[in-house]
Amino acid sequence: DLGFLAINNNGNKLFKVYIGGGLGQNPKTGVALDEYCNPNEVLNYVEAMVRLFIEEGDYQNRAKARIRYILERMGEEEFKNCFKKHLNAVMSEDKLNLNIKEIQCEKEGIKTEREDIRLVEQKQNGLYSVYFHPVGGQADLKILRNIVSAIESMNDIELRLTMTEGIFIRNLNGKEAEELLNITAGCGGETKLEQSVSCIGVPVCQIGLGASQSMLKNILNYFKEKNYTKDILPSIHISGCANSCGFHQGALIGLTGKKKKYNDLLEDAFELHVNGRFSEGNAKLAKVYGVLLAREIPEFMYELALKVEEKNVPFEEYAEKFEAEISELVGKFN
């Protein structure tokens, strides 16, 4: 509905603003506004979108009560002009501006020679971030306590939650980074596949169709049984239903909960989405390849990994060049 992308415009830290997108049923990519947003004005944009929906939203059909359908009805230019009208009205009231102060980290860095997929070197010399990804976003309380206990005695530490169920522990010097890597080793995802994303799903979610957490665990367990530890497949994004809480429609590999009839019985299944992207200037929705039985998906993912490894290319390139091979593999399991 409303997205902010941080940019550096000739030395000015601003946001590029996207409006009118959305996932779920009938997903759409958003459109970019022509003007950039100052960080202290973001709440004005939020209020403007609220007012636009109040005035233009569909109150008769709940299935159409989404911003993207207003964009579809109006067309891009009229929709953008309508938003700007509401934005100008909100800005003229001058009630929602923020006072944002940039925080500078002056901590002295220490270099480390350690190499790890979860270790990220920051712009500041000798400072690092350590990424911790609880499998399925389900963090063990003991591990969290160990992290808190370690960072309590460290200076200027920040924790940043990600949109992919992970945590960046920031502003660590080299020695501190090594300590955090040791504390979190084996406690979360180390490969991209182990860093997959899953909504909570059945049985917790009341509207979900698929047991997304169980699906993820079954995939990872299958790879462990095969002793396959190569970092070949990307993170899989799993949603228990079409609402896309797991962001499956924008992922390189996505699954969404379904039901499928097999031998006259209704079984748990997931719809397969491949090659979605949400990078700047290259956003696209994933292609749907079909519906697979949940019990067969771990084997499917394993065979897919073998095919990608055989081609010796990154998965992004494989998904672009070998669509027919993916379709053939899906057909094998249908």
Segments (PLM) and residue ranges:
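Short amphipathic beta-strand starts and helix->beta connectors
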Residues: 19, 52-54, 113-118, 149-156
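Small-residue-enriched alpha-helical segments and adjacent helix-cap loops
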Residues: 1-12, 44, 134-265
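Short, flexible, solvent-exposed loop/turn segments with mixed acidic/basic and small polar residues
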Residues: 55-60, 119-124, 155-161
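Radical SAM enzyme core and accessory elements
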Residues: 311, 316-334
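Terminal amphipathic helices with adjacent charged low-complexity linkers/tails
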Residues: 54-117, 171-178
